[in-house]
Amino acid sequence: EFESTILGPSVPDLVALTNEALSISITQKKSIIDTTTIRYALHRKTWDLEADRNLSPAKEHGTLFYQVGRAFAHTVLLRNCSIDPISIYIKKNLCEAGDSSLYKWYFELGTSMKKLTILLYLLTCSAGSIAQDLLSPPGPDEQNLITSYGLVENDSDLVHGLSDIVHGLLELEGALVGSSPTEEEVEGTEEEVEGTEEEVEGTEEEVEGTEEEVEGTEDEEVEGTEEEVEGTEEEVEGTEEEVEGTEEEVEGTEEEVEGTEDEEVEGTEEEVEGTEEEVEGTEEEVEGTEEEVEGTEEEVEGTEEEVEGTEEEVEGTEKDSSQFDNDRVTLLLRPKPRNPLDIQRLIYQHQKYESELEEDDDDDEDVFAPQKMLEDLFSELVWSPRIWHPWDFLLDCEAEIPAEEIPEEEDELPEDALETEVAVWGVEEEGEADDEEDVLLEAQQEDELLEEEDEELDEEEDELDEEEEEPKEEEDELHEEEEEEEEEEEEEDELQENDSEFFRVKPIIPRHRWIFRKKKDVFEVLSYPEEATEISKELLRLLNPKTKRDAPKRPRQRWWTKKKQDKHYELLLDRQRWLITKRSLSKSNGFFRSNTPSESYQYLSNLFLSNRRLLDQMTKTFFRKMAFPG
């Protein structure tokens, strides 16, 4: 059936076709490769595969580059690590309190500067972004696909936060452990191991000498014991000879001789038995000495095992150093460990400064008293050389108050109103009647002008009501009405200018007897300096109004709001504490925080480029898996 099909001239083409058919059958979950599958595989191998590859969504490349960078970093740098930090970052539930293995792993990771650099960027998925930059740089209109996948919510904040953590770990390491092990320390460790081996050899020589002494002691004691036994036997033989001579000489006294023989023989036997017991005791001592020699040999063997373990540790340290020192990658420089005395001095200065601030606050309570601040405020604002425009206040008051309710006698005013008048306006009692008459005349003139204006407005309104019946003239009437209103506003402005010229002549502004009829207001002052500028602008607008609307509608309207002064002191203290903390940390942490991301990125980029062959192999593998899933 496939006779017309022309395959490649080599075996790899047939193998590729077989792999293609297998991948299609696995994808379609078929247990048997039929002719349709082979035809489809041949079709895919015959035609260009670019169109088929373009069928996959473009967003999968972000995940692909992330997987490539993660696998590469894990293969090259984290071969001996049992936990993947990227998985910990994505699955935050793994980081639970009380996990001793996780804590131990992170503690070991925190004691190495090189692994800290790796951890910093593995947690921020920089390995994937670096792989994406190296393999396919994004265009100007493309976005960061890795960030769009939600793996990192805010990369910059996380980088800076991890930089602070790394900096704290480095300071802790510098204070507790010191600098990282170098080649000199490794050489010193080797010298210590060699010295330990020499001590072990000397111990072996001592053990050999002890064995020789034990052997010599055994030989000497055994030989001496044998000589004593032989001498005892000779004595026994001599005694027997003497006994025989005694028998020959004294034949008549056999009973005595027998009794003597029995006594002497028994005594000699007891001596021989005692000598044998001494020999047995000597043999037991020799056995105990042999046991001590065996224990010494076991100690020597244990010492040799410790020496071998120390040599293995030294070899492992050399391997760890060579694993990173031979990759020609720029490393981060370790900051110098800080002196504990400097830290104590900084804490002492901070506490001393806080105590001084609290003492100053206690002393300044009288300075910031409300009455004192009230007097200072009026001395600066009220008596400042400004041009005042109080006609708006007067006109408002006269328009709202009927003439019948105005008191005729000055005695009706309360005493506190008079005190407020003198304190605020600074008007002396002399010449008050003349000033009041002038003010009343001016007010009457202004009332007449206002009445005339009101009459004119009423007449105009009547005319407009009559003309509303004509629909064609509505637009013209509206236009005329606007013009008339503008003219009225101009007339009012002219009147105000004339009044301002009148008031400029007088050095002291007269008071109005009705303004302070009621009790004086308690002026409450803001305690926040941030709002001082806004209050000053508001005061200028109220005291020098451009239009009538800007002026306060009531004479009792408050210009200040009440705030607690305690909050102001707390804000000052918090501000000073924040400044002290910022100054202390900016010197040591600013340089590290600003340079760590760029140096770490450069480190991993150089590492990727130095292992470009492995990176290409991983990239091809992931592309093949994406093109042929299953």
UniProtKB/Swiss-Prot annotation:
It is found in: Plastid, Chloroplast stroma. Residues 176-335, 403-501 are annotated as: Disordered. Transmembrane segments: none annotated. Gene3D superfamilies: Serralysin-like metalloprotease, C-terminal. Residues 316-328 have a biased composition (Basic and acidic residues). GO terms for molecular function: ATP binding. ATP binds at G174, A175, L176, V177, G178, S179, S180, P181. It comes from the Eukaryota. GO terms for cellular component: chloroplast stroma. Residues 182-315, 403-419, 427-500 have a biased composition (Acidic residues). InterPro entries: Serralysin-like_metalloprot_C (IPR011049). Keywords: ATP-binding, Chloroplast, Nucleotide-binding, Plastid. Probable ATPase of unknown function. Its presence in a non-photosynthetic plant (Epifagus virginiana) and experiments in tobacco indicate that it has an essential function which is probably not related to photosynthesis. Belongs to the Ycf2 family. This is Protein Ycf2.
